[in-house]
A protein has these predicted regions:
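Acidic, low-complexity intrinsically disordered regions
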Residues: 1-289
Length: 289
């Protein structure tokens, strides 16, 4: 039985699909900004982290193809490409201030640590959307399914695709009852998770941009989150494969047998640490956040 243990490499690259909720509710305040800005920053961090994680000399190795799909009333691909292409073509760079620890010698054999503020340029591939709109998560998963099916047909022996959905809640579209929207989306997500190649089944991970449940990482059962929206996301999440658990432990992410690959009250960047890229096998990811 396939175990989802194929390493993402130049010879066997993987497909990462990121679904980004851009609905009206994402305009609400969150962590000193808005949910949509927070989530969009997370997507840009994910892309940048993967590029840096796979850098070799002057350019990243093409161990991954990334597709970012945004959804509100409509569904559209916001950006896509191999790592080298994405590295060479951000929309712009944003300058942000960041606190770092600077070490210096005290003259007596000791080390002094001092917090200093530096400016850092962050590449931007996806811009936040600030408008009212529905939550056509179903349509986003439909497009993701099409991309995954095509990838699997062309990459029978490569890593099974991974889909990361970053959202604040439940699907709502076509003026339907939200409960019907959830049922339809759960059914489609199950279809996607049943897709497979020689490596294993397609994996769906979820990150909820909401702090109603506090911070919950890789829950073992749905009772660990009480909110309906969180339980819905739990229901459309794959179990963390055993082959991913070494990477999880390496990055201090708690997993147990049967844990689902969903996190609540976080930005989703942690989910990237589960993927075994060629450059990071057996190594920690201390530089990533």
């Amino acid at each position: 039985m396939a175990k989802n243990d194929k390493q993402w490499s130049s010879a066997t690259p993987g497909l990462l699909i990121i679904l980004l909720d851009q609905s009206g509710s994402m305009r609400e305040d969150y962590e000193g900004t808005t949910r949509t800005k927070f989530a969009t920053l997370a997507v840009n961090k994910v892309i940048d982290n993967i590029i840096q994680k796979n850098f070799d000399g002057e350019a990243p190795k093409n161990r991954c193809f990334i597709s970012v799909i945004g959804y509100d009333n409509d569904v559209k691909e916001l950006c896509s490409g191999w790592l080298k292409d994405l590295d060479a073509s951000p929309l712009r760079y944003e300058t942000v201030k960041k606190q770092v620890i600077k070490e210096s010698h005290d003259g007596a054999g000791g080390i002094l640590e001092e917090k200093v503020e530096i400016e850092e340029k962050i590449p931007v591939w996806v811009e936040p959307v600030e408008k009212n709109g529905a939550t056509n998560m179903l349509g986003a998963f439909q497009l993701a399914k099409e991309l995954a099916e095509k990838w699997i047909a062309d990459n029978v022996d490569g890593p099974a695709p991974v889909i990361i959905n970053i959202s604040d809640g439940v699907p709502y579209y076509d003026m339907k009852d939200p409960r019907d929207c959830m049922k339809e989306t759960v059914a489609l997500a199950n279809e996607i998770m049943n897709l497979s190649n020689n490596d294993g089944n397609v994996l769906i991970f979820n990150a909820q941009i909401d702090d109603s449940n506090g911070k919950v990482v890789f829950p073992l059962n749905r009772t660990e989150v009480s909110q309906e929206e969180a339980q819905f996301l739990y229901d459309i999440t794959s179990e963390v494969p055993a082959s991913y658990k070494a990477a999880a432990e390496k990055n201090k992410l708690p997993t147990k047998e049967g844990s689902r690959g969903c996190i609540f009250g976080a930005d989703g960047v942690q989910l990237i640490h589960l993927i075994d890229f060629g450059s990071s096998k057996g190594q920690g990811d201390k530089g990533l956040s």
